[in-house]
């Protein structure tokens, strides 16, 4: 472990479960991100007074949804990191948009904590990692898979909808720890049947949709790679590299367990290659199951589809196509803008209170107790979640999990799974 790295003790490092040291590092991470988002490209090197604006803040610019608002230039008081924003190459004007588009309905601290845990609480490394992830999200247009329907995505990326129609991958139910379960039927994959970009976009689609199903306090997902019937014709090394990169660089700390189920003998030669690509954290989350009954060690029998021996849930995956008119709320620009303004108003308050929280106890403190400030941050985080999911149907296309008589994804952001036992 590198100098300055800190292991996350069990039961810590999560929203509401921070040690004093972890809280300080989270404050520093927030301070740096807000400093950059306010238009500064250099590291936070000074400790300005509370009455003075941070250096360069008078030149702050906004991008995306935040183009018309001036930055709150309240100074932040933390040590500097050594991150060169110019070298990373992210457009500072788009940073705030990337940040809040990524947070969705989660507690804002949750996102930053994922990157801090992934980099063992080294703020410089965590900040570099999250900025690179934001750059990827902007350059690869991750919002596209949320704002476009499956039919629109299929028209642009050959084979996108095919992944859903064949049931190559889908989400159903939760495991014993309450994590949503993503099933991947590897035998269905033939590299030539879709454009590589379509498979990447579908993977991101599953990631972004699956995030909606991770319900607090749960923070991770369970993946089942069903290797039944696998042959070398199904192997796609480029896709595996992309998936590994997603979990390690773009969606860190999102994987709870990855189960490789019933891998045939031919897979073990492939595994020796893949194993070398994995960082120790991801590798530690991989579990092998030899038969169907072993799956019940991970997933309760009542939640496990009965296609697996020991499973009691009479569930069979079936794709429900796009429903005509399901995204008509996109046309209601007036309501969308009103809800967007309400959501933005709350997040601006959250940022302002976060800056106050960063300074709590220091010479530039506001005078309110840290406990009082934290209570307001928590209240605002809850308001943000409510406001986001009111806005969601006006900016996110409805998907498979919004459809049907018993949809999984609810209007308030909760998930309801139906099991047929």
Can you describe what each PLM-predicted range is?
Residues 1-421:
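Basic, amphipathic alpha-helical/coil surface patches used to engage anionic, phosphate-bearing ligands
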């Amino acid at each position: 472990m590198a100098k300055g790295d800190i292991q996350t003790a069990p039961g810590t490092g999560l929203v509401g479960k921070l040690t004093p040291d972890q809280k300080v590092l989270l404050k520093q991470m927030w301070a740096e991100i807000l400093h950059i988002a306010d238009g500064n490209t250099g590291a936070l090197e000074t400790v300005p007074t509370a009455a003075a604006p941070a250096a360069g803040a008078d030149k702050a610019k906004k991008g995306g949804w935040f183009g018309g608002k001036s930055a709150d230039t309240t100074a932040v008081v933390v040590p500097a990191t050594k991150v060169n924003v110019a070298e990373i190459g992210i457009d500072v004007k788009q940073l705030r948009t990337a940040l809040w588009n990524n947070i969705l309905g989660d507690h804002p601290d949750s996102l930053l904590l994922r990157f801090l845990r992934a980099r063992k609480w080294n703020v410089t490394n965590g900040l570099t990692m999250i900025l690179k992830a934001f750059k990827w999200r902007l350059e690869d247009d991750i919002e596209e898979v949320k704002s476009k329907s499956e039919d629109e995505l299929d028209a642009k990326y050959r084979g996108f909808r095919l992944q859903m129609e064949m049931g190559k991958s889908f989400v159903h139910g939760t495991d014993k720890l309450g994590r949503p379960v993503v099933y991947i039927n590897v035998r269905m994959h033939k590299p030539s049947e879709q454009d590589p970009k379509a498979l990447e976009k579908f993977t991101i689609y599953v990631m972004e949709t699956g995030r909606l199903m991770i319900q607090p306090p749960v923070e991770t997902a369970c993946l089942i790679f069903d290797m039944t019937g696998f042959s070398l014709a199904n192997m796609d090394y480029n896709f595996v590299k992309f998936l590994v990169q997603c979990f390690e660089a773009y969606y860190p700390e999102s994987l709870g367990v990855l189960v490789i189920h019933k891998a045939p003998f031919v897979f073990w030669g492939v595994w020796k290659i893949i194993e070398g690509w994995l960082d120790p954290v991801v590798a530690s989350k991989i579990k092998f199951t030899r038969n169907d009954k072993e799956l019940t060690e991970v997933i309760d029998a009542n939640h496990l589809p009965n296609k697996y021996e020991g499973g009691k849930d009479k569930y069979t995956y079936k794709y429900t196509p796009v429903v005509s008119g399901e995204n008509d709320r996109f046309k209601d620009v007036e309501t969308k803008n009103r809800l967007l303004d309400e959501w933005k108003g709350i997040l601006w308050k959250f940022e302002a209170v976060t800056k106050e929280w960063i300074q709590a106890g220091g010479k530039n403190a506001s005078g309110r107790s840290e406990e009082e400030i934290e209570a307001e941050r928590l209240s605002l985080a809850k308001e943000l979640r409510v406001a986001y999911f009111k806005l969601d149907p006006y900016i996110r296309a409805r998907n498979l999990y919004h459809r049907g008589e018993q949809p999984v994804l609810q209007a308030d952001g909760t998930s309801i799974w139906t099991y047929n036992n």
